[in-house]
Amino acid sequence: MGKVRAFFSRKGRGNSSGRSRSMREAAMNVDWSPRPSDLAAAAAAKPRPPAAEDETERVFRKFDANGDGRISRAELAALFRSVGHAVTDDEVARMMQEADSDGDGYISLGEFAAISAPPPGDAAAAEEDLRHAFGVFDADGNGVITPAELARVLRGIGEAATVAQCRRMIDGVDRNGDGLINFEEFKLMMAAGAGFGRIAS
């Protein structure tokens, strides 16, 4: 779910440099605003391994509710609202305009993959994106992700997640044994590519 964290981390940035870094990090705020140079950099980047491609496609399918191979404005808004993030029609229109590089009014898998790729060498942006993604899961803002908070977000994006399953997922990354995920544990998990994308059985 590294990509989902990307999608939800850009809402409400007031300065253009924050918006220009792209739509990355949905998983979970909103303001994805790639510049053409960001899209070109993502396209020129070395190919991603199959696991990253599979993850990108899996997240894309979460957005593409009707399965037609493209994300519509309504699908984009519905997903964000389903995880409790109010987005205005203007925000959705801006996201669509900035992500839709071919101007057809939809986001294709290729456009989605291009805007999901982090810009090369931008460690500060990556850290900021992780903080925003963490904040989406940490609904009460107390600095840790609980099993219930994790289950809420996963259910919001269409994953059938119980609190018990989320406890097991947390156990896999909980280094201090408190049954919760703090930001440092979250960073390690995302860096390892574990994510929350696969529900424990």
UniProtKB/Swiss-Prot annotation:
Function statement: Potential calcium sensor.
Gene field: CML15
Protein name (database record): Probable calcium-binding protein CML15
Domain of life: Eukaryota
Binding site for Ca(2+) 3: D138, D140, N142, E149
Positions of the UniProt region annotated as Disordered: 1-55
One family name in Pfam for this protein: EF-hand_7
Family matches, as SMART domains: EFh
InterPro entries: EF-hand-dom_pair, EF_Hand_1_Ca_BS, EF_hand_dom, EF_hand_pair_protein_CML-like
Protein's organism: Oryza sativa subsp. japonica
Residues that hold Ca(2+) 4 according to the record: D174, N176, D178, E185
PANTHER family linked: EF-HAND CALCIUM-BINDING DOMAIN CONTAINING PROTEIN
